[in-house]
């Protein structure tokens, strides 16, 4: 996750 937005997206997808 290069950008913070990507990291948040990853967390959301994991749920």
Curated annotation (Swiss-Prot):
GO CC annotation, single: extracellular region
One Gene Ontology term of the biological-process aspect is: neuropeptide signaling pathway
Location relative to the cell? Secreted
Q: List the disulfide bonds.
A: none
Keyword entries, A-Z: Neuropeptide, Secreted
Location, primary (coarse class): secreted
Superkingdom, taxonomy of origin = Eukaryota
User: Which family, according to the similarity comment?
Assistant: Belongs to the FARP (FMRF amide related peptide) family.
Q: Give the protein's function.
A: FMRFamides and FMRFamide-like peptides are neuropeptides.
Q: Can you say what this protein is called?
A: Extended FMRFamide-12
